[in-house]
Amino acid sequence: MLHLAKDGIFPITKDKDGKLLKELPASGLHVAGTIQGEGKLNGVPSLFIRLAGCNLHCTWKTLAGNTCECDTAYAAFKVENSFSLPVEEIVRIIGHNRGNIDHIVITGGEPFLQADKVRALCLQLKKESHFHITVETNATLYVEECAEMIDFFSLSPKLSGSVPPAPHMDHHNKTR
């Protein structure tokens, strides 16, 4: 089971059985997918899988002195509305919403906190549909067993405002 943040697979219009969802995606359209808006693959039609949990707790001060936190705190450390799904069900949902989309973005939180399940998901997505897979990561964890199935890593290194829990602090400070 993968632990997903709320709206963990998005934007989709069909459920695991291929039936239309009662609620429209945030776009307001009965069209699955969106356009990757960042980085090298900017403009590529994509589906996203947002996993729950992060090994960091990013906060920072603005020039005006306001405290800000992670832009996806609901996926990182405020995971009250998270849920779990089996890898096979995620693959079915993706399959029913694929259309002409060939790109999957696995993001978080930090996906590599669930490395074994991410690896299993990537294996299934490659086996079933030959998707191009991007993983968006904070670059504090590297799991070699996953690397061979991932086509592109989108690294988002963190600054001194990221404060991981104690077990990860030494590694974080060395690799920052």
Which residues does each PLM region occupy?
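Auxiliary Fe-S-binding modules of radical SAM enzymes
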Residues: 1-38, 43
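A basic- and aromatic-enriched beta-loop-alpha substructure that forms the phosphate/nucleotide-
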Residues: 20, 24-29, 90, 97-104
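Short linear motifs at secondary-structure transitions and domain/linker junctions
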Residues: 21-27, 78-81, 126-133
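Canonical Radical SAM [4Fe-4S] cluster-binding loop centered on the CxxxCxxC motif
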Residues: 25-89
